[in-house]
Amino acid sequence: MSLATDCPSSLASASERPLLSQVQLARAAAQHTATLPTAIKNAALEAMATALLEHQEPILAANRADLERAAEMVKAGELSASAYARLKLDAHKLADMVAGVRQVIRLGDPVGRALLIRELDEGLILERRTYPLGVLGVIFESRPDALVQIAALAVKTGNSVLLKGGSEALLSCQALMAAIQAGLQQIPEFPQGSLQLLTSRAEVKALLQLEGLVDLIIPRGSSSFVRYILENTRIPVLGHADGLCHLYVDRAADVDMAIKLTVDSKTQYPAACNAIETLLVHKAIAPHFLPLAVKALREKGVELRGDPLCRELVPDLIPATEDDWSTEYADLILSIKVVGSLDEAIAHIQQYGSRHTEAIVTEDAAAARRFLDEVDAAGVFHNASTRFADGFRYGFGAEVGISTQKLPPRGPVGLEGLVTYRYQLRGQGHLVADYTGPQARPFQHRDRLNNTGLA
């Protein structure tokens, strides 16, 4: 039966039929890539990496054209400065993208792994093995580098993916996809149709309605953008709506370390979802720490907003409002609050945080342990910048996004988050009837997989 026949009639409107054809091609490709040998997938990834380097000039030229158009959008108020910053590519960023692809090559293949091997009875063996999800729909704003990260992870995990970047990144995405496709064409065993680029909002709207045909939607972008996706599809969604991160400077913090971590967590890349938006400072260390931190942050061009206790110590801070505690600036703006205790810091984070990434700076091991154990977030750090919350930095090779939901996968989602599992049962004519009733044969339930994952 064809996919178009399986699809509800309401989804098969004339405007959606071209997309259905693309999804059909993607599903057919996914059946093939699901069983590709690791060597073929790695060869495809190396071909992608090589092609990206060979196509550097047209990629950067396309990006410059996007930036020119995006600059006018910023002037017109149609695009934020942070989105403009995420759009920019250069030779260094392209080299990082290629390094990310090659790191994925070095990672183990997540497909076909045995998670469980159990002998239910003699000759009756149950296995739980990893398998690709199938067809992914990934929609992202700005950040054309996301296209390369996602494509690499899709290839390694044997998934097909339909990618849609923001209109402001259209030319960049087209140039990147052209390079990737040129590379994949060098690997005859790799099926066409596994990586596809969508280019219109109408396609996104139609994609969100393809429940049963698309297995997972992954949005990457602003909180309003992610909320739109969540509210307009019944397909499972993996992602986060906000990146409202905090750094708490404890009373026992090393001041020099705390200043460096504050500056790095805010200014290293302020448009990133793992940059801090609020700095919490214990009242015992605030008189010493705050003036120094304010000076260091202002040298980086950060606009600072403080609560009344902060402004007693640094009077020229902009007064912080209630809205500031729940705002993801994604810009060189930081709110600062003085707290009376670790308990108050944790309570503030639990009330206003987005469960993305939270950090404490302290030399008190007990305070650090409490913070790590009690703060509910996908990433909880001690004496480390929140900017480490990233799939590449975690050694995942790349990430398709960061999930703040409680159910797994959580945090930066790399290879392991793009596979599911199947139960495979091998018997020798075993019947359930033999295991029921007064003369029931007992199960043995002997595990054959040790703690290392080896049989």
From Swiss-Prot:
Disulfide bonds: none
Xref: SUPFAM superfamilies: ALDH-like
Function recorded in the entry: Catalyzes the NADPH-dependent reduction of L-glutamate 5-phosphate into L-glutamate 5-semialdehyde and phosphate. The product spontaneously undergoes cyclization to form 1-pyrroline-5-carboxylate.
HAMAP family xref list: ProA (MF_00412)
Organismal lineage: Bacteria, Bacillati, Cyanobacteriota, Cyanophyceae, Synechococcales
One Pfam family recorded for the sequence: Aldedh
UniProt organism field: Synechococcus sp. (strain JA-2-3B'a(2-13)) (Cyanobacteria bacterium Yellowstone B-Prime)
GO cellular component: a single term: cytoplasm
Protein name, as recorded: Gamma-glutamyl phosphate reductase
Keyword line: Amino-acid biosynthesis, Cytoplasm, NADP, Oxidoreductase, Proline biosynthesis
Family affiliation: Belongs to the gamma-glutamyl phosphate reductase family.
GO molecular function: glutamate-5-semialdehyde dehydrogenase activity; NADP binding
